């Protein structure tokens, strides 16, 4: 059962850095719906992409799976036999709830839920990889290595879905979309105090990149094609394709 996010509704004397702890995990579904514009659309469209890209006898990786929303969307849309989904997160609280969510939905495609660091996971025989609002929590210097590993582990014709909060090279555009995002959160019932305290906790942990920076990294990793397929304010998702034909 999801609870309403009121974690920051009262003043907090000492704000530390953001962590995906038990308190966050408990309210996460409400929090992300009220904080990330277009989140439900991205989740449902990840399932549509899975229907197009997941191949028989291959694996799908959901790296930074949180409570398993993307994993479940993929699982619902797989049309082939002998596929496997590997869902990974380093938060024990998230993983515990993710396992419950996966177990509650019965489907023929098996899901392995792994508590671990996505940087340590071996990617192999993958037809699809999902990084849904995950890369932004890695140190910028570590992001290229992860994308390189994903590219190498993808089969020809495979796809990476990369969803992120974006920064913008045009400061005027960045300011506009930042303000519109805050309007979105206010419209969803968050107070100025809640918005401010959460932003303070995230500012040293969630470091955003521009779409241009993401595309440059993807090219460097080897992806022959990449494009922004969804955007709402300063949030969006790219798809990157490895050339070749799926076996």
From Swiss-Prot:
InterPro entries (alphabetical): CmoA, Methyltransf_25, SAM-dependent_MTases_sf
Residues bound to S-adenosyl-L-methionine: 39, 64-66, 89-90, 117-118, 132, 199
Gene3D superfamilies (alphabetical): Vaccinia Virus protein VP39
GO BP term, example: tRNA wobble uridine modification
UniProt KW keywords: S-adenosyl-L-methionine, Transferase
Domain of life: Bacteria
Catalysed reactions, as listed in the record: prephenate + S-adenosyl-L-methionine = carboxy-S-adenosyl-L-methionine + 3-phenylpyruvate + H2O
Molecular function via GO: carboxyl- or carbamoyltransferase activity; S-adenosyl-L-methionine binding
Keyword Transferase in annotation: yes
EC number from the UniProt entry: 2.1.3.-
NCBIfam families noted in UniProt: carboxy-S-adenosyl-L-methionine synthase CmoA, PRK15451.1
Stated role: Catalyzes the conversion of S-adenosyl-L-methionine (SAM) to carboxy-S-adenosyl-L-methionine (Cx-SAM).
Family: Belongs to the class I-like SAM-binding methyltransferase superfamily. Cx-SAM synthase family.
Subunit structure: Homodimer.
Name of the protein in question: Carboxy-S-adenosyl-L-methionine synthase
Organism: Salmonella arizonae (strain ATCC BAA-731 / CDC346-86 / RSK2980)
